[in-house]
Curated annotation (Swiss-Prot):
Pfam family name, one: Dirigent
Name of the featured protein: Dirigent protein 7
Function: Dirigent proteins impart stereoselectivity on the phenoxy radical-coupling reaction, yielding optically active lignans from two molecules of coniferyl alcohol in the biosynthesis of lignans, flavonolignans, and alkaloids and thus plays a central role in plant secondary metabolism.
Predominant location: secreted
A biological process term (GO) from this entry: phenylpropanoid biosynthetic process
Residues bearing carbohydrate: N70, N91, N126
Lineage of origin: Eukaryota, Viridiplantae, Streptophyta, Embryophyta, Tracheophyta
Domain of life: Eukaryota
The species this protein was found in: Arabidopsis thaliana (Mouse-ear cress)
GO (cellular component) term, any one: apoplast
Signal peptide: 1-21
UniProt record similarity statement: Belongs to the plant dirigent protein family.
Keyword Glycosyltransferase attached: no
Keywords on record: Apoplast, Glycoprotein, Secreted, Signal
Localization in the cell: Secreted, Extracellular space, Apoplast
Length: 186
């Protein structure tokens, strides 16, 4: 009798598991992109200047975790709210902010992990943003990092950016970097 009860209970549990698994299949479904008003995909190129200011009374970048040694920047983590402008000069026309963090990840080279959003504040792209996540080999003339997403007019964005250092002050750590952005979006 105990064997029969064990077999019946096992079968009931097995049936319940199968029914439960089928219900889980309905959590995702394919939908038509037209429901989101997505039209033809386009490629947008724009150039902005990223101003990383660590010095002065109102820095836009703050080191929240100092490096683990004096011989390298490895381990350093910096939070940013950097100006994005149309020209190299820091006081040129503001188009947005670069907000995020960068962390010195190279023990033997000057490389950083960049995690940031370019949040646009003017013109057609006001309120839209792109998300950049990637390795920045800081001493390389041209660095390429992926665009992994976006919001607003850049919803479903993908692409890449090329970063070129325009100016760097070794004493303060302040820098201006040109970001040439190539973004596919709808």
């Amino acid at each position: 009798m105990a064997k029969l009860i064990l077999i019946i209970v096992t079968q009931i549990l097995l049936i319940a598991a199968v029914v439960s698994a089928r219900k889980g299949e309905n959590f995702a479904k394919t939908i038509d992109k037209k429901h989101f008003g997505l039209r033809k995909e386009k490629l947008t190129h724009f150039r902005v200047y990223w101003h990383d200011i660590l010095s002065g009374s109102n820095p836009s970048s703050v080191v929240i975790n100092p490096p683990i040694s004096n011989s390298s920047f490895f381990g350093s983590v910096t939070v940013i709210d950097n100006r994005l402008t149309t020209e190299v000069a820091v006081n040129s026309t503001l188009v947005g902010q670069a907000q995020g963090i960068y962390a010195a990840t190279g023990q033997r080279d000057a490389s950083a992990l960049m995690v940031m959003n370019f949040a646009f504040k003017t013109g057609k792209y006001n309120g839209s943003s792109i998300a950049i996540l990637g390795r920045n080999a800081v001493l390389t003339k041209v660095r390429e990092m992926p665009v992994i997403g976006g919001s607003g007019l850049f919803r479903f964005a993908r692409g890449y950016v090329e970063a070129r250092t325009m100016w760097f002050d070794q004493k303060s750590g302040d820098a201006t970097v040109e970001y040439s952005c190539y973004v596919l979006h709808y």
